């Protein structure tokens, strides 16, 4: 565990020490200089995360009814230190600024945000819902909890996704072994605590979602 990443709320303090904001606006990346600046050597010591993570973006303008699900998802950037996370995060659009239909993912490196990925295939997801434009802080704290290894069953976590829709935004936390009820319930309870989220949340198996689509029912609730 990284000392600087103690809990979601405290990580906000490190934001001021690693901010490199450059304005602009195009899809997710706000600055054309963002990726190039991340490649430059940094004189200050960087603080490694336990895992490397990759941001993925599903561009709504690139989707078509004929295209296979997930065909428009593309990786944006992989980071492995606290400082690189903030450099990326501070230069991308937050959920409230994303176009309707956009899906933005953050998954452990080498795990693709798809049901078909071998690590995700037997998993499932917890989901939280928010009014349109109200998920920015909870999305950030979800990311901080994940990359800071705040979950007791963190090895179960694959990643998280924010879905931006017309009337609402949803954050889902993907896990790898849906049948492990003890681990999934622990993750769901801790996630609610980290975000101070009071509504009930449900866990759906990916297998159920593939077979039943929107008719899939929650297997666990907290």
Curated annotation (Swiss-Prot):
Q: Write out the annotated subcellular location.
A: Nucleus; Cytoplasm
In what ranges is there compositional bias, type Basic and acidic residues?
Answer: 1-22
Record InterPro entries? TIF_eIF4e-like, TIF_eIF_4E, TIF_eIF_4E_CS
Magnesium as UniProt keyword: no
The molecular function terms in GO held by this entry are: RNA 7-methylguanosine cap binding; RNA binding; translation initiation factor activity
Tissues with expression: Expressed ubiquitously in seedlings, roots, leaves, sepals, petals, anthers and dehisced pollen, with highest levels in pollen, maturing anthers and roots. Strongly expressed in susceptible plants but not in resistant ones.
- Pfam families xrefs: IF4E (PF01652)
Origin superkingdom: Eukaryota
Query: Which Gene Ontology BP annotations are present?
Result: defense response to virus; regulation of translation; translational initiation
Q: What happens when the gene is disrupted?
A: Plants lacking both eIF4E and eIFiso4E are semi-dwarf and exhibit an overall reduction in polyribosome loading.
Biased composition of type Acidic residues is found at 23-33
Q: How is it modified after translation?
A: According to the redox status, the Cys-120-Cys-158 disulfide bridge may have a role in regulating protein function by affecting its ability to bind capped mRNA.
Q: Which family does it belong to?
A: Belongs to the eukaryotic initiation factor 4E family.
In UniProt terms, what function does this protein have?
Component of the protein complex eIF4F, which is involved in the recognition of the mRNA cap, ATP-dependent unwinding of 5'-terminal secondary structure and recruitment of mRNA to the ribosome. Recognizes and binds the 7-methylguanosine-containing mRNA cap during an early step in the initiation of protein synthesis and facilitates ribosome binding by inducing the unwinding of the mRNAs secondary structures. Key component of recessive resistance to potyviruses. (Microbial infection) Susceptibility host factor required for viral infection (e.g. potato virus Y (PVY) and pepper mottle virus (PepMoV)) by recruiting viral RNAs to the host ribosomal complex via an interaction with viral genome-linked protein (VPg).
Subunit comment: EIF4F is a multi-subunit complex, the composition of which varies with external and internal environmental conditions. It is composed of at least EIF4A, EIF4E and EIF4G. EIF4E is also known to interact with other partners. In higher plants two isoforms of EIF4F have been identified, named isoform EIF4F and isoform EIF(iso)4F. Isoform EIF4F has subunits p220 and p26, whereas isoform EIF(iso)4F has subunits p82 and p28.
Name listed for the protein in its UniProt record: Eukaryotic translation initiation factor 4E-1
Species of origin? Nicotiana tabacum
């Amino acid at each position: 565990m990284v000392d600087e990443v103690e809990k979601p709320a405290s990580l906000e303090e490190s934001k001021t020490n690693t901010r490199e904001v450059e304005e602009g606006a195009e899809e997710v990346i706000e600055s054309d200089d963002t990726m190039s600046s991340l490649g430059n050597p940094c004189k200050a010591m960087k603080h490694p995360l336990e895992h490397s993570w990759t941001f993925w973006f599903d561009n709504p303008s690139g989707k078509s009814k004929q295209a296979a699900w997930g065909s428009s998802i593309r990786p944006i950037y992989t980071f492995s230190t606290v400082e690189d996370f903030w450099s990326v995060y501070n230069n991308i659009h937050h959920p409230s600024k994303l176009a309707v239909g956009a899906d933005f993912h953050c998954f452990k490196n080498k795990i693709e945000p798809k049901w078909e990925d071998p690590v995700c295939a037997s998993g499932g997801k917890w989901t939280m819902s928010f009014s349109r434009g109200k998920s920015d802080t909870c999305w950030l704290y979800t990311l901080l909890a994940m990359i800071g290894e705040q979950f007791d069953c963190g090895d179960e976590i694959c990643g998280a996704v924010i879905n931006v829709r017309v009337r609402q935004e949803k954050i889902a936390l993907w896990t790898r072994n849906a049948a492990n009820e003890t681990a999934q319930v622990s993750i769901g309870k801790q996630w609610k605590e980290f975000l101070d989220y009071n509504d009930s949340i449900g866990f759906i198996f990916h297998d159920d979602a593939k077979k039943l689509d929107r008719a899939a029912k929650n297997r666990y609730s907290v």
